[in-house]
């Protein structure tokens, strides 16, 4: 709070001895050897002049905080709050405010702004003709907080009082309007009361629905001021039945070897890959990830271990093939031909899935009203205009004419003996994986797909290539070999 000025010496009796002695001492000390001024008795006129002199000696005139005005310009929603530099400098007691605080943002008042302040009784008509300067209100408040805390405290009290008066005025106006309504109540017809109730309920329902929709769409997350955490609604999730989440007496093992009820249940298909020492299948590849090339592994493993384990491998494969050959003919799907690696060179020891085997009595898929994917025609006519039956993929809905796919009659007959796959669905017969399409080659007799590294080849061979399954069915080379050996023996 600003200090209240003490009574000036001129307000006391001029004839007071203390005052007169001070006057005499000043006159005696001011003499510098010249003729001393004559003493005069202080009259009424002298007291007024002495009062003005003492006022200037004590300091600048007091500017009350009530006169410090903060206004908004422009008055609309886009306006900002300002203060007049002349009022601020007079309130803070700063003579040259601009030179002392040159870094503050300031601007000159426009003519419209001066007229607005004149209407608000902030400035006088004389001040309208002068050049006035506006300062940003927030910068002035920050300056008072840092360098003039007493002035800021005094101004804060005034602001609180103004806010209290504004709230009281608004409350009085609202109370007066309510009283007027109570004195003059509206007359409602009794027959229209149910209609008004329905309208009110409808309006309330619309408000609640709009409020909930706005809260879910625009205010789903909120900032917690106490924990400084952004709270987000929890997502919906499915709840398991109680019997699935009920814990037993041994939920988890606390020491090694202790029994626990939580363990993984493997399906029969998964057990074929476990345990490692008696696994029937190789570890499967993840369809979502690219398979690793096994060219180098197959080449190095075949070259280094072929000589050392040739006899043992041949005996194992021969014994396994004799038993597995019978199981293939009988149609038992749970048996697998061999445990050899995909890169091992053994025609009889390559594991193959049942979908690539020629199953006796297999019937190909029948799709009515199928259309060829190449010529976009049905079985009534192919690209040459002749009727031709279509072949269908066993995995998808693709179909095609054999002539459009450049397939021979023998190849079509072979395809109808097993679940044939189109180019988009083609998988390797050995590893059952669709990866490494650049290393995939196809048999010219049955159109089955094989990876080069799965059959022990470095690259795709040139010319015609026949897979192991089709080479078993070809009996001509075997007869020639049998006829040659007796001739040599003779």
Swiss-Prot record:
Residues 284-293, 314-331 have a biased composition (Low complexity). Residues 83-292 are annotated as: SAY. Residues 294-305 have a biased composition (Acidic residues). InterPro entries: PHF10_PHD_finger_1, Znf_FYVE_PHD, Znf_PHD, Znf_PHD-finger, Znf_RING/FYVE/PHD. Signal peptide: none annotated. A zinc finger (PHD-type) spans 371-428, 430-473. SMART domains: PHD (SM00249). Residues 1-61, 284-362 are annotated as: Disordered. It is found in: Nucleus. Keywords: Metal-binding, Neurogenesis, Nucleus, Repeat, Transcription, Transcription regulation, Zinc, Zinc-finger. The keyword Nucleus applies. One of its GO terms (molecular function) is zinc ion binding. One of its GO terms (biological process) is nervous system development. One of its GO terms (cellular component) is npBAF complex. Belongs to the SAYP family. Involved in transcription activity regulation by chromatin remodeling in the context of the neural progenitors-specific chromatin remodeling complex (npBAF complex). May play a role in the proliferation of neural progenitors. PANTHER family: HL01030P-RELATED (PTHR45888), PHD FINGER PROTEIN 10 (PTHR45888:SF4). Component of neural progenitors-specific chromatin remodeling complex (npBAF complex), a subfamily of ATP-dependent SWI/SNF chromatin remodeling complexes. This is PHD finger protein 10.
């Amino acid at each position: 709070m600003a200090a209240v000025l003490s009574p000036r010496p001129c307000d006391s009796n001029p004839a007071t001895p203390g005052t007169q002695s001070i006057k005499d001492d000043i006159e005696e000390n001011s003499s510098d050897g010249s003729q001393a001024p004559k003493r005069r008795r202080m009259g009424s006129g002298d007291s007024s002049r002495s009062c003005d002199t003492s006022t200037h000696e004590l300091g600048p005139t007091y500017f009350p905080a009530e006169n410090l005005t903060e206004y908004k310009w422009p008055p609309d929603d886009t306006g900002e709050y300002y203060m007049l530099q002349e009022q601020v400098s007079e309130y803070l007691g700063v003579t040259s405010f601009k030179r002392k605080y040159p870094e503050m943002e300031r601007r000159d008042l426009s003519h419209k702004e001066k007229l607005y302040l004149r209407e608000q009784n902030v400035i006088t008509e004389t001040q309208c003709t002068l050049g006035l300067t506006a300062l940003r209100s927030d910068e002035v408040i920050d300056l008072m907080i840092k360098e003039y805390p007493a002035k800021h405290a005094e101004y804060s009290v005034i602001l609180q009082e103004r806010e209290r008066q504004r709230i009281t005025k608004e409350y009085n106006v609202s109370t007066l309007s309510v009283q007027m309504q109570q004195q003059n109540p509206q007359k409602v017809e009794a027959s229209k009361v149910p209609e008004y109730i329905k309208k009110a309920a409808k309006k309330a329902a619309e408000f609640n629905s709009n409020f909930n929709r706005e809260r879910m769409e625009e205010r789903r997350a909120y900032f917690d001021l106490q924990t400084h955490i952004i709270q987000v609604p929890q997502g919906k999730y499915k709840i398991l039945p109680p019997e699935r989440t009920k814990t037993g007496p041994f939920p988890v093992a606390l020491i090694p070897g202790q029994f626990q009820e939580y363990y993984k249940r493997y399906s029969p298909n998964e057990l074929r890959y476990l345990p490692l020492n008696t696994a029937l299948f190789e570890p499967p590849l993840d369809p979502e990830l690219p398979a690793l090339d096994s060219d180098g592994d197959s080449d190095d493993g075949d070259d280094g271990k072929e000589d050392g384990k040739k006899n043992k491998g041949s005996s194992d494969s021969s014994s396994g093939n004799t038993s597995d050959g019978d199981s293939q003919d009988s149609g038992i799907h749970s048996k697998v031909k061999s445990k050899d690696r995909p890169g091992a060179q053994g025609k009889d020891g390559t594991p193959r899935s049942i979908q690539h085997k020629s199953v006796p009595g297999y019937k190909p898929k029948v799709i009515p009203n199928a259309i060829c994917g190449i010529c976009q025609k049905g079985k009534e006519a192919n690209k040459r205009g002749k009727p031709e039956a279509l072949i269908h993929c066993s995995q998808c809905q693709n179909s095609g004419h054999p002539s459009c796919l450049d397939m021979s009659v023998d190849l079509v007959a072979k395809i109808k003996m097993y679940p044939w796959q189109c180019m988009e669905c083609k998988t390797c017969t050995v590893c059952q994986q669709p990866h490494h399409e650049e290393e995939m080659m196809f048999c010219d007799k049955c159109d089955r797909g094989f990876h080069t590294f799965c059959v022990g080849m470095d690259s795709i061979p040139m010319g015609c290539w026949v897979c192991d399954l089709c080479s078993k069915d070809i009996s001509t080379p075997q007869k020639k070999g049998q006829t040659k050996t007796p001739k040599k023996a003779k």
